[in-house]
Amino acid sequence: MDLHNIREDYSKRELSEADCADNPIEQFERWLDEAVRAQVNEPTAVNVAAVDGRGRPNSRMVLLKEVNSEGFVFFTNYHSRKGRSLDAHPFAAMTFFWPELERQVRVEGRVERLAEKLSDEYFESRPYQSRLGAWASAQSEVIPNKAVLVAKAAAVGLKHPLHVPRPPHWGGYIVIPDLLEFWQGRPSRLHDRIQYRLLDGGWIRERLSP
């Protein structure tokens, strides 16, 4: 397969410093709102990259479940590869990509586990079958076949026919950012890149060369 000529010339929008909020979280919320209104497919999907105890990088897609003044929240199995990596090295990089808008956002920062109360509250909001799955799946572990997983979920359902409590190995993380970059595709590969970096408790906004 020849990949050399697979390319797009971006021209839909531009990003100027005058259009950017002083606070990067506010800027992110603006762009996320525009992605939702534009009916971007899975606008909250984000790639999370981490480094494990051996220094090997790994990444995967998760769903952003909250953004607030503190940072970016997602939920997972703490015993999964990503959970073990984040516990070993509590830093992460996140990338949102909204091709319909020719935009991406990068986030870097320190990672903390979310308070158990907040993880409990979110878990209670999940569909019943999803809560069963959180108990049934030993995420990232090798299993002999799919039937084993289905049987485990059924067993959890028999044990908890009405209320499924949150497993202790499942909960949230928050990425507390110290760097965000907003990328807007432009013609001739002269893309707009506006970066915010945290310095002495305040945000510095600057333009990067594409």
Swiss-Prot record:
Superkingdom, taxonomy of origin: Bacteria
- Which processes are annotated in GO (biological process)? pyridoxal phosphate biosynthetic process; pyridoxine biosynthetic process
Question: Which positions in this protein are listed as binding FMN?
Answer: 60-65, 75-76, 81-82, 104, 139-140, 183, 193
Record: residues binding substrate: R7, E8, D9, Y10, K65, Y122, R126, S130, R189, L190, H191
Q: In which pathway does it act?
A: Cofactor metabolism; pyridoxal 5'-phosphate salvage; pyridoxal 5'-phosphate from pyridoxamine 5'-phosphate: step 1/1; Cofactor metabolism; pyridoxal 5'-phosphate salvage; pyridoxal 5'-phosphate from pyridoxine 5'-phosphate: step 1/1
Q: How is the cofactor bound?
A: Binds 1 FMN per subunit.
What pairs make up the disulfide bonds?
A: none
Q: Which Gene3D superfamilies match?
A: Electron Transport, Fmn-binding Protein, Chain A
InterPro entries reported in the protein's UniProt record: Pyridox_Oxase, Pyridox_Oxase_CS, Pyridox_Oxase_N, Pyridoxamine_oxidase_dimer_C, Split_barrel_FMN-bd
Question: Does Phosphoprotein count among this protein's keywords?
Answer: no
Q: Which reaction does it catalyse?
A: pyridoxamine 5'-phosphate + O2 + H2O = pyridoxal 5'-phosphate + H2O2 + NH4(+); pyridoxine 5'-phosphate + O2 = pyridoxal 5'-phosphate + H2O2
Cofactor entry: FMN
Q: Which UniProt keywords apply?
A: Flavoprotein, FMN, Oxidoreductase, Pyridoxine biosynthesis
Q: What is its EC number?
A: 1.4.3.5
Q: Which PROSITE patterns match?
A: PYRIDOX_OXIDASE
Molecular function per GO: FMN binding; pyridoxamine phosphate oxidase activity
Transferase is among the record's keywords: no
Q: Could you tell me which PANTHER family the record lists for this protein?
A: PYRIDOXINE-5'-PHOSPHATE OXIDASE, PYRIDOXINE-5-PHOSPHATE OXIDASE
How this chain assembles, per its entry, is:
Homodimer.
**Could you say which protein family the record assigns here?**
Belongs to the pyridoxamine 5'-phosphate oxidase family.
In UniProt terms, what function does this protein have? Catalyzes the oxidation of either pyridoxine 5'-phosphate (PNP) or pyridoxamine 5'-phosphate (PMP) into pyridoxal 5'-phosphate (PLP).
What protein am I looking at? Pyridoxine/pyridoxamine 5'-phosphate oxidase
Say which species the protein is native to. Neisseria meningitidis serogroup B (strain ATCC BAA-335 / MC58)
Please spell out the taxonomic lineage of the organism that makes this protein.
Bacteria, Pseudomonadati, Pseudomonadota, Betaproteobacteria, Neisseriales
